[in-house]
Amino acid sequence: MRFNGLDLNLLVALDALMTERSLTAAARKINLSQPAMSAAVARLRSYFRDELFAMRGRKLVPTSRAEGLAAPVREALMHIELSIIARDAFDPAQSNRRFRIGLCDFITIVFFRHVAERVAREAPAVSFELVALADEHDELLRRGELDFIILPEPFMSSAHPRIALFEERLVCVGCGTNGELRRRLTFDRYMTMGHVAVKLGVARMPPIEESFLLDRGLNRRIDILVHSYGMIPPMLMGTSRIGTMPLRLVKHFETTMPLRIAELPRPFPTFTEAVQWPVLQNSDPESIWMREILLQEAARMTSTSDDCSMSYASEQADTEGRLTSVASRLS
């Protein structure tokens, strides 16, 4: 099929080449022989009057013209797939959809494992690829290379639809033997104590508390920098260092490590974790089903963890009461 002299099948070939950066892999992806893919490249070069790709070692490197074509071609193909091509009615139990989701280890441990467990029961052929957060997550959504991202709302753009999942609060955490956390933590002490801090994923994305401090021109003392939340607790053991982590995640690690939890000094805010998806998938039945699963599991987790939060608040109040009583006796 041609449009203004362009064989539209060539756009499928161009999209595969941009995604795979390999002639052989691109041909395999769209079920073409390698000679047929080579012929498609020649026709693309002729139509666009540009080399489009150059070989560097065993990898195809796109020209600036090819880079400029990549996003609109991907969007056009996604629009055709989602809006024009007729699809069978969606049946989760029969679906073999693979969802690519960008998220951090905090979300994986405290939330997404419940989602995966439920999907395994209700849609056993549905699979997931969980990827580290990247700087260009907004662009990856636009190109359809990610189906969802799960992030704190302040880190999301307005280019794609999103919906809130659950609220989370941060706490200070240290080794169970850390005597510095036995008394109320002031902001000055928080800033000057040695921190084990996280920069998330390949993007080295600052966590919510780091963004909060940097927005105010403040820098805390960081002794150890790690790339995932799960690396913080082991690095606290046997030291007087502290970390800042989501409460739900701390409660998870508290079952296997001797941790001491302390309230952060005011005014550290709570934050909302949200899910975002490509605007072109807004009406996609499979995406809608997955969103409903995410929302339902978030509501279920929130209802069960409210009891945990109330218990934690009660423990904190009891501890503060005991400390006040001791202080009054000493005075």
Curated annotation (Swiss-Prot):
Keyword field contains Transcription regulation: yes
Pfam families attached to this UniProt entry: HTH_1, LysR_substrate
SUPFAM superfamilies for this protein: Periplasmic binding protein-like II, Winged helix' DNA-binding domain
InterPro entries: LysR-type_TF, LysR_subst-bd, NodD_PBP2, Tscrpt_reg_HTH_LysR, WH-like_DNA-bd_sf, WH_DNA-bd_sf
Start-end of DNA-binding region: 23-42
An MF annotation (GO) of this entry: DNA-binding transcription factor activity
Residue ranges constituting the HTH lysR-type domain according to the UniProt record: 6-63
Keyword Transcription regulation carried by entry: yes
Keywords, comma-separated and alphabetical: Activator, DNA-binding, Nodulation, Repressor, Transcription, Transcription regulation
Coiled-coil residue windows: none
Other noteworthy facts: There are at least two nodD genes in B.elkanii.
Family affiliation: Belongs to the LysR transcriptional regulatory family.
Described purpose of this protein according to its UniProt entry: NodD regulates the expression of the nodABCFE genes which encode other nodulation proteins. NodD is also a negative regulator of its own expression. Binds flavonoids as inducers.
Protein name per the record: Nodulation protein D 2
Record lineage: Bacteria, Pseudomonadati, Pseudomonadota, Alphaproteobacteria, Hyphomicrobiales
Gene: nodD2
